[in-house]
Amino acid sequence: MVVGVVWLPLEAHPRPTHMSVNKTAAEAEAGMTLAEVREEILRDYRICVMSREASLLGRKEVLGGKAKFGIFGDGKELAQVAMAKQFRPGDWRSGYYRDMTFMFAIGELTVQQWFAQLYAHADPAAEPASAGRQMNGHFATRSLDEHGNWRNLTEQYNSSPDISPTAGQMPRLLGLAQASRVFRQNTALHAHTHLSDQGNEVAFGTIGDASTSEGHFWETMNAAGVLQVPLAMSVWDDGWGISVSKEHQTTKGSISTLLQGFQKEEGTNGIRIYRTKGWDYAHLNKTYEAAIALCREEHVPCLIHVEEVTQPQGHSTSGSHERYKSPELLEWYKEYDCNVKFRQWILGFKPGGEAIATAAELDAIEQEAKADVRAAQKAAWAAYQNEIKAERDEALGLIEAVDPAIAAELKAEMNPGRKEILSAARRALVLNAGAPAANDLHAWTERALEENRERYGSHLYSESAQTCLNVPEVSVEYAPDAEMVDGRLIIRDNFAALFEKEPLLLTFGEDTGKIGDVNQGMEGMQARFGELRVSDTGIREATILGQGIGMALRGLRPVAEIQYLDYLLYCLQGLSDDLATVHWRTRGGQKCPLIIRTRGHRLEGVWHSGSPMGMILNSVRGVVVCVPRNMQQAAGMYNTLLQADDPALVIECLNGYRSKERMPANLGEFTVPIGIPEVVREGNDITLVSYGSTFTICARAAERLQDLGIDVELIDARTLLPFDRTHRIAESLQKTNRLLVVDEDVPGGASAYIMQQVLEEQNGYHWLDAAPATLTAKPHRPAYGTDGDYFSKPSIEDVVEKVIAVVRE
């Protein structure tokens, strides 16, 4: 059964590269000639067989040793061609590693590029999705020009960058769809025509049926039904999750049946649910045309459950599905193979009483596709190998002059990679240090290592002119009679200034809207700027993050609020796997300048006093991490970040909202430099480094220590990623010769990270006359209450005693 399917006029959604869905002869007369119908059907068939040939040949290339791993879209071709017909310029995809046919069909992936990714060709010209950084089947388009500026996203087909974790694509899909709602309903944004055509874009999502068991899927679909955003979710249902059948995956064995409670009815929100077969060309086309029309025009989310999809080659090159699938099922795969069924349908389709194609014509298409795929594979392999062979030949001459035996080993390698070349060069240098010819080889090796650091490691953070590192510092200003106010008022009024001057800015989270967040940092903002820009969400951190990622990918400036730092764990997977890697895994092809606002460190209770900074730091490289000591510093960081294009996490101090601070005069203007610590108190006896809420403890301890004759140099790290770019802490050590790092993470957490940065990166150990020390929270979680806090986290007395111990060593 297909729910709510209606026919639409042929001309309703014209596409520049594909015509509308095929009709009967009578319907074709109204909008398409039979010749055009025939042309479209045969083009679709060619895409399907070309994609299948790529999958088959790709598997052979992996098993033959030319590539490391292969995962393919065979069996899903026909549904993806039908979906592609409804995909317009400006639309967005958030899918997964089976979608090769779709990418071929919209013209954003060539077969040669597909093979280039299979071989890990680390050149964005050859492999524009990830420049060889991702395994095959991970697709993306390029949203940025060579300077890191937005292209016109409404004139191109857009795909967000795929990740491997199952259902990991779901949260960002929600944000991609919500952006259309924002662009449609906020008329102030209608002038941003390079980002949206007044919200007429659909966000297309795809997922394998087994992955619908993941929480991300349910959280996203529920939120989409609440928000009413143009999200079109396709489920490719082949009945398996690797070796586990859907009887063990899904209640009642059907995701569309299970979702019936989500069904949108008259006068309600929810989603529209459609069901179709992966081998039924005509029905697929009808279903997608109806579903996407409703989604695009009325912003009603939909789910298209594509059943009876096959998997001819099994899950991937990792193993054989013959181990766990029955012979009967494998025979059924052959009978209901979508390409086989499509061929049968074409031969039986006679709109004018005559078949639109003969078996011989289809045979010719298949042979041509096979030849074209083979040619593309050869071209991709040659392009990939030619670069490396040139590097090998250059290295061989230099290695031979130093160590002929190692050179001979390298020459004997079949299809060596850069690893083998550099490994040989470095071995030769180690074994022949001091050889006359070693200098030339050393110079070549250093140059090659630097080139490969760039080739595989660039763009972890923004490298554009808009990087946060380039935002000029603007000092905070105070009126002579500046009022002492609660810190929350500085945050509130600073955000108000930012909302006034930046129409792309919006914020959302649990309790963010109506009450202005649980600490009143957004008090009155929803009434002032509207529910579209300052909104509440459900309790669903993974998709709060996803909303931010998706909207930031589309050029909006979202501030996603996670109510407490302790709850960041609910969205840490997306923060680590998706947000932190966007810029790197596209080699600068996309950016995601999302700001995550949260609050943490000491307050009351096990799950309202967390400071798991080591866990965060080791999970989110690629994200700027700011740890302000007060609300003026936090406001300055927001002012900096909103002028930049890096993703960032700002952790406000939970116990700072009621602390009194002077109200700045230049709200929305003053900035805090990223990666530059601040020496808040100068001293000569010891360098004390801290951040966040613990910094206040250290400041009070420093006053007591002064009375004891110990002169503390107190430094606020301010940001942990990046950390002390100017080596200000090492400079302090040259004067004090002693170091203590204080925080409220567990032992070996962020304090150990800071110590590594100071001692190893900054060579701070040169200046020490005493062993460097850390003072941290206890290994257990913070206990409840004032006494629990005192005996769980560093106190003023702890800091004083630790400083005395270090100074007296």
What label would you give each PLM region?
Residues 281-301, 361, 585, 589-600, ...:
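Phosphate/diphosphate-binding loops
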Residues 590, 600-604, 608, 621-627, ...:
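Active-site phosphate/pyrophosphate-binding segments
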Residues 9-10, 16-79, 85-86, 312-529, ...:
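Conserved acidic/glycine
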Residues 77-81, 158-401, 405-420, 506, 654-809, ...:
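Thiamine diphosphate
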Residues 53-234, 239-241, 245-263, 268, ...:
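Cofactor-binding active-site loop characterized by glycine-rich and histidine/acidic residues
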Residues 95-97, 167, 206-207, 234-237, ...:
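Short beta-strand segments
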